[in-house]
């Protein structure tokens, strides 16, 4: 492989801001695996955020890249799995598997797509020193997937310079599993590993029941994370996520403070967790290739404490990302902490965002 920009390359990053900034090019924020695609003839490499190749996990994308992208190019984008119900990040995580037979099976069962949003090289030309406005125009010209062909696996992300349109995308596209809006100043060059773009994500709060804790990796004298629950319509307490960003002094204080609430699994709403795969974990599918060797066992607590947390969005019945501590809510009845309090976005079809994407 001999390209003007050679792997590995760390992708250009975005800093979080609270509002959509003016005078930028706006794109939907896709929720998948960030990947820089390198193609030199039949040679294809899919890089990752940590610069480790993901090529072997997505054979269907390698074939699509050879069929749909220019003969020699380097393109920044996102690997996603699109379904009739929106993006499926959990299915995407399952694609990272050591067994080639399973990789092939999942490539057929849950094929991935590639959303292109920046151009680093084309032919013999290095585009990283050119302004984004020029890179974007060349990207649209270069990628065949910018059309509405449902048989294509490579697509160019939509973009606009209109703030009102960007605000509408921010409000509506969450219903398809997207993650907010990215704003790119039109003059910026491609700057690997630099936060020169802007990301605007949703921010919400929820009152959750503290149902357990995990000890800190440094030892058993501190809390690692608190396990959160919400009550379902049938009265069962469901696992909804975790919070874990506490100063070490607070982690130790919490461990002492929560000891009176420690209970046995027999008396806990997640009493089945002690018997699943020999591990005490509130999620049957919590183990994955991403956390091999990580202890996910937990100490059960009587569900009597309520905490207000910040979160961006839901994926199914759980917080998509780790929630953030806001404050304790001693005034709240734990039984009142249900899914009914959560804002539910309107459902949007992915094909309404990118024609041909399903």
From Swiss-Prot:
SUPFAM superfamilies: DNA ligase/mRNA capping enzyme, catalytic domain, Nucleic acid-binding proteins. Keywords: ATP-binding, Ligase, Nucleotide-binding. Pfam families: DNA_ligase_A_C, DNA_ligase_A_M. Disruption phenotype: Not essential for growth (in strain Erdman). Gene3D superfamilies: DNA ligase/mRNA capping enzyme, Nucleic acid-binding proteins. It catalyses: ATP + (deoxyribonucleotide)n-3'-hydroxyl + 5'-phospho-(deoxyribonucleotide)m = (deoxyribonucleotide)n+m + AMP + diphosphate. This is DNA ligase C. It comes from Mycobacterium tuberculosis (strain ATCC 25618 / H37Rv). The gene is ligC.
């Amino acid at each position: 492989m001999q390209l003007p920009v050679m792997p590995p390359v760390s992708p250009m990053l975005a800093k979080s801001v609270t509002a959509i900034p003016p005078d930028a090019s706006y794109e939907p924020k896709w929720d998948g695996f960030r990947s820089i695609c390198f193609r030199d003839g039949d040679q294809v490499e899919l890089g990752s955020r940590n610069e480790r190749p993901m090529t072997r996990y997505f054979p269907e994308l390698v074939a699509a890249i050879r069929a749909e992208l220019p003969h020699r190019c380097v393109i920044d984008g996102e690997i996603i799995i699109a379904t009739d119900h929106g993006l499926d990040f959990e299915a995407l995580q399952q694609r990272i598997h050591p067994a080639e037979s399973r990789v092939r099976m999942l490539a057929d069962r849950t094929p991935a797509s590639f959303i292109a949003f920046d151009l680093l090289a084309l032919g013999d030309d290095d585009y990283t020193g050119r302004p984004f406005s020029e890179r974007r125009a060349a990207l649209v010209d270069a990628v065949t997937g910018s059309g509405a062909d449902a048989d294509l696996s490579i697509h160019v992300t939509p973009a606009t310079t209109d703030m009102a349109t960007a605000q509408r995308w921010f409000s509506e596209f969450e219903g398809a599993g997207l993650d907010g809006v990215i704003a790119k100043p039109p003059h910026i060059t491609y700057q690997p590993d630099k936060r020169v773009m802007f990301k605007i994500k949703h921010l919400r709060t929820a009152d959750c029941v503290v149902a357990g804790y995990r000890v800190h990796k440094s030892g058993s004298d501190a809390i690692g994370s608190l396990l959160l629950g919400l009550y379902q319509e049938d009265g069962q307490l469901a696992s909804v996520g975790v919070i874990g960003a506490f100063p070490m002094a607070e982690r130790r204080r919490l461990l002492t403070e929560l000891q009176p609430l420690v209970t046995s699994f027999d008396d806990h709403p997640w009493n089945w967790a002690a018997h699943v795969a020999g591990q005490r974990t509130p999620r049957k599918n919590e183990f994955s290739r991403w956390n091999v060797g990580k202890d996910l066992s937990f100490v059960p607590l009587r569900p009597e404490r309520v905490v207000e947390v910040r979160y961006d969005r839901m994926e199914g019945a759980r917080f998509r990302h780790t929630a953030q501590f806001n404050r304790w809510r001693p005034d709240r009845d734990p039984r009142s902490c249900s899914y009914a309090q959560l804002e539910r976005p309107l459902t949007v079809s992915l094909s309404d965002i990118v024609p041909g994407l399903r």
